[in-house]
UniProtKB/Swiss-Prot annotation:
This is Protein HIR2. The keyword Phosphoprotein applies. Transmembrane segments: none annotated. It comes from Saccharomyces cerevisiae (strain ATCC 204508 / S288c). The gene is HIR2. The keyword Transcription applies. InterPro entries: HIR1-like, HIRA-like_C, WD40/YVTN_repeat-like_dom_sf, WD40_repeat_dom_sf. WD repeats lie at residues 10-47, 118-158, 163-201, 237-277, 278-316, 320-359, 546-587, 589-626. Component of the HIR complex, which cooperates with ASF1 to promote replication-independent chromatin assembly. The HIR complex is also required for the periodic repression of three of the four histone gene loci during the cell cycle as well as for autogenous regulation of the HTA1-HTB1 locus by H2A and H2B. DNA-binding by the HIR complex may repress transcription by inhibiting nucleosome remodeling by the SWI/SNF complex. The HIR complex may also be required for transcriptional silencing of centromeric, telomeric and mating-type loci in the absence of CAF-1. Disruption phenotype: Abolishes localization of RTT106 to the HTA1-HTB1 promoter. Present with 922 molecules/cell in log phase SD medium.
Length: 875
């Protein structure tokens, strides 16, 4: 080992941070002075291969800043260099020339002030996760962590910490799964992070850590299994001393080993070598694998290098500096340690293989990372899950009813916790800010008449076993006057849905016209201070009031159709206005609170808290179909029990199409539509088809955007079934695809989507299930065809029918294929459908295309030839 102690040629400055990036070591001084040295040149100087007088920095420049401040943070990669003080953060892109591996001049670098905070808020740490491409900025006083996207520097999200604690330093996970924060209240917070900035607190460790308002440098092991905790004071009497604990992430963060030395008291810098070492024992024919850790205290200038297998210092540079060590960093190969002291002296510890051991290849480290415990996939926030382009004929409103509603079937006891819903995204100074409105729900009523409570069967002398102990007589409850009033329509209802809580103020803007804003300011719910409802139009940043009304009630939900606006009150009254503010009809009084209120086109859909479903045609001012209920959707037979109250599935979506078809999805993934002709609910999307159907698209989720669908008319000569299936899957206007997307979301949320292939392989090997896949596939296609008829989608119906007939032909289902051909050949129009299906030539033209597509399938030519002759396709 060789040590190079090199005092930097800077006057009256300190160097607080360094970083090993590529072949360079970057230093940042207190006056905004940045220097870059070649690592190999420093190592060669340590081994006397280069004269020390020839040693000089590769480049040196001054950080562009209005007021000079100390630089404490430096991080980045080979593309962008991030340099930060306690109030500002700069980015230097293009600092390294990829072709020559040389540092560009300052003139060729693109510098930009990325972030700035004002006193009393300060930046306590800046970390960059190269795997996720996320930059973490820790802020004190505001007590939060900002997450920015690398390169674009868009704000992804922020992590808010309790007001009583401040984030001191962060620790990056080499695998990009977690981000650990050490706070001023001696707690350690472990967050799960993904590339979109979604985060979740997965652990709050009890391993207390004593942190001071200093700038700490801490890193994890390269295999990402050990989390170091410096200055741990858990279980130490009177806090007389502290130690450095190594926690095993795969064993619920339990302490595996401990470093205890005088210099570890008040540890400030702890950096793992990025290499994983192996030392063979030639006598025994074995080898030992271990990590190396470099540590330094906050006051003395001692540097220790630890072997994690022996837990004893492998190397001890006792008081190598008369001042404290500010920062340390290992080279990528793990054989050089760089350190900077408070007196601006650069230390280069150049080791050899005989000193440290053999560094294993990176592939070995990757394999060790794969052994670590895998975290479940993070669920994206609701606002992130809403697709950018909704189906044209279905509109999900940004109102309370778009959030999952807890519901109780027959008898329900509790409601779901309040959910928060993100709404609009705005761009300000290049940073995307998210405005959110909190939507909370009142739990469903669980009051029942006293006489309906089931009582246990009383014991009589005839049914008491001889010798059994006599039961103690229970005390009878005392009845009081002025007990709570029971509402009969709620207390006797078989369904109880949660209702939105009252918000003091909220705004609503329809998706198809964001310039119109309905502003609701709730009053006290009486004549003394009525609610103000105002519709404004934003044109060229000018607000114009279209209409205003005063309602002596509290408003909960609002929505809008093509030519009308509607909102409902807490007591179940619905108000409907035109765009100019004219009331289209008198208030509709339902007498019970409303859980969902949705509009699309000329239709208004309402779902009450007791499960009643109303659908009005506002243009014709009448019910689209008789009042119905959602009770059959909630599996009443499966939910029955002896208790009065039981839980049911949550309603995650309740909406309506432009043609007046109600749609409902549940938290189990099932999707339904209401058939007004049959006056019953139809199953549209079932999670079972995801397990067995070959035409179920598991990648169709709201977190992914499909390519633009081909909306041109279908060409019957196109016989490639794969192209047709791809065209169907990529149709963003398809309601069926949208409901199947919701099913995939629920399967992902419950972690079932990853078991689909395993389930399919297992079940198909069992006796009697060999043809299960083709049967489920045909069942899935048949259901989609029938639903497309009810939704009056002739384009989608034609494509699905083409795929279905080709599939029947390939599988040899001749009788079923003949049945389909006969149905298409008949002159009878498809019942209960619109003008497109009513055309008498519609089915005949479709049959011609199918016959041409199936004509080259030999095993069904006997069927296709007969119909082709009847239709004069062949002679």
């Amino acid at each position: 080992m060789r040590l190079l102690k090199y005092p930097l040629d800077i006057h009256n400055e300190q160097v607080n941070a360094l970083a090993a990036l590529g072949p360079y070591i970057i230093l940042a001084g207190s006056g905004g002075h940045v220097m870059a040295w070649r690592q190999q040149q420093l190592v060669d100087t340590a081994f006397d291969r280069v004269m020390i007088k020839d040693l000089k920095p590769e480049v040196s420049f001054q950080v562009d800043q209005d007021t000079t401040g100390d630089i404490f943070f430096i991080t980045g990669d080979l593309e962008t260099l991030y340099i930060g003080s306690e109030h500002r953060l700069w980015g230097y892109s293009g600092w390294l020339c990829r072709d020559t591996n040389n540092i560009n001049s300052v003139e060729k670098m693109n510098s930009k002030l990325l972030f700035e905070c004002k006193s009393p808020s300060t930046i306590t740490d800046v970390k960059y996760d190269i795997n996720l491409g996320i930059l973490f900025v820790l802020l004190s006083n505001e007590n939060k962590i900002l997450l920015f996207r690398h390169k674009t520097f868009d704000k992804l999200s922020e992590i808010t910490i309790d007001k009583a604690s401040k984030p001191i330093t962060g620790i990056i996970d080499p695998t990009g799964q977690t981000f650990t924060v050490m706070t001023s209240d001696r707690s350690i917070l472990v967050y799960q992070i993904n590339k979109t900035g979604t985060h979740k607190l997965i652990n709050k460790l009890t391993q207390h850590v004593q942190m001071y308002p200093l700038h700490y440098r801490i890193s994890m092991s390269p295999q990402a299994d050990i989390l170091p905790v410096i200055n741990s004071v858990k279980g130490v009497p009177n806090n007389a001393t502290s130690c450095t604990a190594l926690l095993d992430r795969n064993n619920n963060y339990k302490v595996t080993k401990t470093l205890v030395t005088p210099s570890s008291n008040g540890c400030r810098v702890l950096v793992y070598s990025p290499a994983f070492y192996e030392k063979p024992n030639l006598k025994k024919g074995t080898s030992t694998r271990y990590n190396l850790i470099a540590t330094s205290g906050s006051t003395d200038g001692t540097i220790l290098v630890w072997n994690t297998k022996r837990m004893k210092p492998l190397f001890n540079a006792l008081q190598v500096s008369s001042t404290a060590i500010n920062d340390m960093s290992w080279s990528q190969d793990g054989f050089t340690l760089f350190a900077i002291s408070n007196d601006a002296t650069l230390y280069t510890f150049a080791f050899q293989e005989k000193d440290l051991g053999v560094a294993l290849p990176q592939t070995e480290i990757k394999s060790l990372q794969e052994v670590n415990k895998k975290l479940p996939k993070l669920e994206e926030p609701l606002a992130e899950q809403i697709p950018k382009s909704f189906p044209e004929n279905i509109k999900l409103e940004e109102s309370a009813s778009a959030a999952p509603i807890p519901n109780d079937i027959g008898r329900s006891a509790v409601g779901k916790k309040p959910t928060k819903k993100k709404t609009a995204n705005n761009q300000t100074n290049g940073i995307k800010t998210i405005q959110s409105t909190s939507m909370e729900f009142n739990t469903p009523s669980y009051t029942v008449p006293r006489d309906l409570k089931r009582k246990p069967k009383e014991a009589t002398p005839s049914n008491i076993a001889p010798g059994s102990k006599k039961q103690k007589k229970e005390l009878q409850p005392i009845d009081f006057l002025d007990t709570g009033l029971l509402l009969p329509n709620t207390s006797f209802s078989r369904i109880r849905l949660a209702t939105p809580k009252i918000r003091s103020t909220f705004k609503y803007s329809p998706i198809n016209n964001p310039n119109l804003i309905l502003d609701v300011k709730n009053g006290s719910g009486n004549e003394q201070r009525p609610t103000i409802v105002k519709l404004t139009s934003k044109v060229l940043d000018q607000d114009q009031v279209l209409f205003q009304d005063f309602i002596p009630k509290l408003i909960t939900i609002c929505t809008a159709g093509d030519t009308f606006w509607s909102f409902c009150s807490e007591d179940g009254s619905i108000y409907i206005y035109s765009d100019s503010g004219r009331k289209l009809m008198a208030p509709l009084v339902l007498g019970v609170s409303i859980s969902f209120l949705e509009a699309c086109g000329t239709y208004l859909l309402c779902l009450t808290s007791i499960g009643e479903l109303y659908c009005w045609n506002i243009e014709q001012k009448k019910l689209a179909f008789p009042t119905n209920t959602i009770y059959p959707l909630l599996n009443p037979s499966l939910r029955y029990s002896d208790d009065i109250l039981t839980r049911a599935e949550n309603i995650t979506l309740c909406s309506i199409t432009k043609k007046g078809v109600p749609l409902v999805t549940l938290s189990n993934g099932d999707g339904y539509l209401f058939d007004k002709n049959m006056e019953t609910w139809l199953l549209v999307s079932d999670g079972w088809w995801a397990y067995g159907s070959q035409y179920w698209d598991t990648t169709n989720t709201t977190g992914l955007s499909s390519s633009k669908a081909n909306t041109d008319s279908f060409n019957g000569s196109e016989s490639n079934i794969n192209e047709i299936v791809s065209d169907i899957k990529n149709d963003n206007q398809s309601i069926i695809n949208f409901l199947e997307c919701k099913t995939n979301d629920e399967l992902n949320r419950k972690g079932r989507i990853k078991n689909l292939q395993r389930f399919a392989r297992t079940i198909l090997m069992k006796e009697g299930f060999e043809n299960m896949e083709e049967i489920v596939t045909l069942s899935h296609l048949e259901n989609k065809i029938l639903i497309s008829i009810r939704l009056e989608e002739p384009e989608e119906f034609s494509k699905l029918m083409m795929v279905y007939c080709i599939r029947l032909s390939e599988l040899g289902y001749m009788d079923r294929l003949n049945d389909v051909f006969q149905w298409l050949y008949d002159d009878l129009p498809i019942s209960g459908t619109g003008s497109a299906f009513a055309d008498k030539d519609f089915k005949r033209n479709l049959l011609k295309k199918i016959l041409i597509a199936c004509g080259d399938i030999r095993q069904v030519q006997r069927v296709t030839t007969r119909y082709a002759k009847e239709m004069n396709i062949i002679s």
